[in-house]
Amino acid sequence: MNVRRTPWWHAAIALVLGLGAGAGVAVLGESSGTTLIGTPWFVPVVLGVIGVIALVLAINVHQYAATDPKKRPKTFVNPSVAFNTLVLCKAMILAGAALAGWYGGQIIPTITHIEGSFYEQAVLQCAVTAAVCLADMGIGFVGEWLC
């Protein structure tokens, strides 16, 4: 099987598309009177946990693959798990970039209303979630390299 690394510009395109979509939804929400900005606090927690799990899986695959077969412990990494870890890391690159753009895009039009308590909380939620998504994207690149 021949697997190629995800080019950096795929993540850049996903980030820009997410940025445009997030900003568009925030502007649409402001003009229509219904808001779709912000995110619950459990979202960055769940995304962070997924990132840590993916990193641990990628490290396990790398340790198994990089060790001399004669010196390997009696452990075995299932090829399906190794492949799924690689796919998870590739998905985290694109999803992390798109979601970081989405939440970052929501911040741009609403930053002018930050004096309101709702908008202040929404901007904070979006900023934290965007940072976690960027970290997930980085973990995806590292995990892909490790696999």
Q: Where are each of the predicted segments found?
A:
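Long, highly hydrophobic alpha-helical transmembrane signal-anchor segments
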Residues: 2-51, 104, 116, 120, ...
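Loop-to-transmembrane boundary segments
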Residues: 83-96
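Membrane-water interface at transmembrane helix exits
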Residues: 25-30, 59-66, 105-109, 144
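Alpha-helical transmembrane segments and their membrane-interface junctions
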Residues: 94-115
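Membrane-helix interface/capping segments
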Residues: 58-82
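Alpha-helical transmembrane segments and their immediate juxtamembrane interface regions
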Residues: 2-5, 115-147
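Hydrophobic alpha-helical membrane-embedded segments
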Residues: 41-63, 137
